[in-house]
Amino acid sequence: MFKFALALTLCLAGASLSLAQHNPQWWGSRNTIVHLFEWKWSDIAEECETFLAPRGFAGVQVSPVNENIISAGRPWWERYQPISYKLTTRSGNEEEFADMVRRCNDVGIRIYVDVLLNHMSGDFDGVAVGTAGTEAEPSKKSFPGVPYTAQDFHPSCEITDWNNRFQVQECELVGLKDLNQHSDYVRSKLIEFLDHLIELGVAGFRVDAAKHMAAEDLEYIYGSLSNLNIEHGFPHNARPFIFQEVIDHGHETVSRDEYNELGAVTEFRFSEEIGKAFRGNNALKWLQSWGSDWGFLNSEQALTFVDNHDNQRDHGSVLNYKSPKQYKMATAFHLAYPYGISRVMSSFAFDDHDTPPPQDAQENIISPEFDEDGACVNGWICEHRWRQIYAMVGFKNAVRDTELSGWWDNGDNQISFCRGNNGFLAVNNNLYDLSQELNTCLPAGEYCDVISGSLIDGACTGKSVTVNEHGYGYIHIGSDEFDGVLALHVNAKL
């Protein structure tokens, strides 16, 4: 009987931890993460204070924080080739990172770190030098900055069969030296690294290449982590939020379902399908059942996004900033529809897969600069600063915890729906105008369309819609309009 009770206690404790690891630890009604890809820590701190907090963002995913190899030309992917766990990168040093985390937490913005637990750097010709000056010999699996030696890695082999579990989880992903997470020593170094970040005040982690690690090893590592630091405003016994990169198209041996109880999982099918729909390859009317009915994960397990730093560089259905009208429509739908844990992308301009972030002649990352409207101008795209996107972050806050209702469509690519009595969204992806009296579900009054303008000092700088006592309003979205979407909510009532 004692053994059964002990087993039950351990099982319940494990379930409790895994549920806690799905909690992003947001402040108030905030509920959108932005990925400030390759930004410097000092710039993120200022962005938290001056832009993200005032506009209701909930958190920031930051690029990898630990020392990485220096690659010729400084491509973005060098950040994903670690050689030690020292907190020095082109984004800044440990002091600057800690200052950023503190300042962002102070204004209610949580920090989630992209962490590399699967591997160290790939082969390098001779001795490699990292961003903190550490030397390593990746070809010999020698990383004295940790330290790791060859015995801490799986034997070298190549992934040639993605349906072979051994290859996927113990061979080298694109030549990156594959750590043995089943080793007590390797586990201890990874836990030490993550716990240090927790001590500095981070709220959680995006786990890169999670499918290339056995779920039972990750379960042990996650379960061994410290609780979040209460000195940064987290409640007692709060667990780090975990979201794991698992690319699962539904036909491979290693499945997302092995990981979704450990934490949230990046729902790549969401990204692919929303791209198909707003590129016109699937009618928007079918989006009424968007979510788990499409074969996606359950809402509380899914980290959702239109694009990410990887797939925005690939060809195919995924939308990115280079198709701005469709991208803004897709993002508006993403943030308005009640499904998933939402993350928006903030990119830099790229011409090819390897384009580095904006940098000076000495290869130092440069700070974003802004025009009079607050848009970025010097190689940074900053989608999160587009009015049509940050306004939808405010919309999502206004409609939090409300249900989808009042769905309407024209049988094709014009749709609208309500979020309770708090918000209304309409989209026109047809080649003709949407002009229709529609149920907005909102209380009677005049509302500012937060896509075409902003509510400033009681006046709307864009379109406005008058809602009658029955909740109906006249909605017009011309086929030639730049945005193709209209959004109203109770916090934008004139």
Swiss-Prot record:
Disulfide bonds join 48-104, 157-171, 376-382, 418-441, 448-460. The record marks 310 as: Transition state stabilizer. It comes from the Eukaryota. GO terms for molecular function: alpha-amylase activity; metal ion binding. The modification Pyrrolidone carboxylic acid is found at residue 21. Its EC number is 3.2.1.1. Its main location: secreted. Ca(2+) binds at residues 118, 169, 178, 212. InterPro entries: A-amylase/branching_C, A-amylase_C, Alpha_amylase, Glyco_hydro_13_cat_dom, Glyco_hydro_b, Glycoside_hydrolase_SF. Binds 1 Ca(2+) ion per subunit. Its cofactor is Ca(2+); chloride. It catalyses: Endohydrolysis of (1->4)-alpha-D-glucosidic linkages in polysaccharides containing three or more (1->4)-alpha-linked D-glucose units. Chloride binds at residues 206, 308, 343. It is found in: Secreted. One of its GO terms (cellular component) is extracellular region. Monomer. This is Alpha-amylase-related protein. It comes from Drosophila dossoui (Fruit fly). The gene is Amyrel.
